[in-house]
Each structure stands twice: as C-alpha cells, then as structure tokens.
Amino acid sequence: MASYLDFEKNIQQIDEDIINAQIKGDTEAVSILKKNLEKEISKTYKNLSDFQRLQLARHPDRPYALDYIELILNDAHEIHGDRAFRDDPAIVCFMGYLGEKKIIVIGEQKGRGTKDKIARNFGMPHPEGYRKALRVAGLAEKFQIPILFLIDTPGAYPGIGAEERGQSEAIARNLYELSDLKIPTIAIVIGEGGSGGALAIGVADKLAMMKNSVFSVISPEGCAAILWNDPAKSEAATKAMKVTADDLKSQGLIDDVIDEPTNGAHRNKEAAAVAIADYVKKSLNELENIDVRELSANRMQKILKLGAYQEA
C-alpha cells in the first residue's frame, strides 16, 4: 500500500478515486481522473520547499540501494563480511554488470518493514559495515573495477558497541583510503546523506545527489534542538542549513544533480534507476579516459578545496 506525505493529500485522494472508478468499471472516469492526477502531481512537485524535499528523501516508499541494484545491475553477486568481526547488513556490496561494464556497488540499506529495518539497523552502519565497504573497495582496486557508492543513511550508528569497536576510526580510515584509490569512483546520495555516516562512503571522483535527496552534517531536528532547544523548528533549520541538492551544487560541494521523475523517485522507481544508470555510464566514460594516478590526485585536490574561503 502506498504511503503519502502531508503535502501529497490531494494526490492520495485522486489515487483513491481512480481505484474506486476502476472497481466500478467506469473507464471514462478513470481517464479523466488520470489526467487530473498528472496536473496535481505537476502542481505539487513544481515548487517544493526544502523541508518537503527532506520529507521526500525519507519517504518510506523511496527506492533504497537494493532496489537500484536490482534494477540496474545484471548478473549481480553479493559480497559479505569485513573478515574481522561480522557482516553488517546496513552496508550492502555487490559485483555485477552495468550494461557491458563490470562494476562494484557499495550502498547503505535502511530496510523495509519492521523486521528488515531492525536487522539493517535503520541504515545506520556499525564500524564493521564501513570496514566491509573498505575491504570490497580494496578488491575493486586490485582487479581494476570501478565503484558506485549509494549513500542513504541518517548517520553512522552511535551506540556503545559501535564506539567500542572504533566507529570514528573506521570512518576516518575510509576517508583516508578511499581518497587514494587508483580506480574510477562515483558516489550518489539517493536519500539521506547523514554526516560522517555518509562521508565514509562518499569520497569519490564524482559526487552527485538525486534531486530530492539531502546531505548535511546533522539532521535538521538535531540542529533545531541544539540551536533553539526545540526540535519542532526543524523546518526553519532545514532551510537555514542548505541541505538540498540544488543548494549544495550552487556552493560547489557536489558535482551534479540527477533529476528524478516529476512525481518523485518513490512513485517511479524504474525511471529513477534509469536516470542513475545513465549518469553512471556517462561518468565512467569520462573517468576511464583519465590516468588512475591523475584521478587520485584530482580527488585529493577536490577534498582540500572543501571549506576554502578568501577574506575580503
């Protein structure tokens, strides 16, 4: 059953009217309602606020990493474990083919349904998850296979066990090692890009965001609680933090924005997957013509430029 956000109520009503008309066999009404639905979708999604985009980034029906992997990869095989502690289900790693290109995909997976969400820790990786990602990245470098990172997490897990096993070290190690990989790498924020939990698999030659995704150092609710002692002011915090894809592109913090279907990725997963696949193919064609040592050097320079400013 589809889920709807507060600002999608008119869309929900028309969807329900279409279902009722189909049950009655009223084809004329269905045709009229579908046209009305297209108009309402266009109207609703034309001028979304930053907070509404945040809601879309967290939409329960939004495609997750495994959805995209299933849609864009052929002959996919999963790689498990960090070879030190355990296999963290919050990080998924697959080797397969994107068209005719061999590729490795490493993604953060939130999970669907109560049991799956709990098993995957709501997409919050433990340090062993990041170490699994790094191990697989090492395999990719060894066999000269490009990597696609799919970022979607509220943040790295802050639990006691995670801290005892070196959460901060695992994130720092990934930043260090991924910045120097001698292979083409692409990272895409497909939903939430939560702080260090996102950065740990976000160091790449190309960093892109889906149109309705967000990327921030802290959640807007956390920001509002700290600055105003009121989590209810998260909408104001979202606007002030500039968390959307367009905001980050205008600041030069990401390379590209990937357009979603007009009605959002959650209502047309196949079209969203095609957009990602096309972007990855185009980017790989560009990156594969650059010497791997130059790629590594360019990646490092891009990192060093982050946060740079000039005094007036």
UniProtKB/Swiss-Prot annotation:
All copies of domain CoA carboxyltransferase C-terminal, residue ranges: 36-286
Catalytic activity: N(6)-carboxybiotinyl-L-lysyl-[protein] + acetyl-CoA = N(6)-biotinyl-L-lysyl-[protein] + malonyl-CoA
UniProt-listed InterPro entries: Acetyl_CoA_COase_a_su, ClpP/crotonase-like_dom_sf, COA_CT_C
EC number from the UniProt entry: 2.1.3.15
A Pfam family it matches: ACCA
Localization terms from the record: Cytoplasm
GO biological process, one term: fatty acid biosynthetic process
Keywords per UniProt: ATP-binding, Cytoplasm, Fatty acid biosynthesis, Fatty acid metabolism, Lipid biosynthesis, Lipid metabolism, Nucleotide-binding, Transferase
Keyword Endoplasmic reticulum: no
SUPFAM superfamilies on file: ClpP/crotonase
Domain of life assignment: Bacteria
One GO CC term, this protein: acetyl-CoA carboxylase complex
Family per similarity comment: Belongs to the AccA family.
Subunit details: Acetyl-CoA carboxylase is a heterohexamer composed of biotin carboxyl carrier protein (AccB), biotin carboxylase (AccC) and two subunits each of ACCase subunit alpha (AccA) and ACCase subunit beta (AccD).
Role played: Component of the acetyl coenzyme A carboxylase (ACC) complex. First, biotin carboxylase catalyzes the carboxylation of biotin on its carrier protein (BCCP) and then the CO(2) group is transferred by the carboxyltransferase to acetyl-CoA to form malonyl-CoA.
Protein name: Acetyl-coenzyme A carboxylase carboxyl transferase subunit alpha
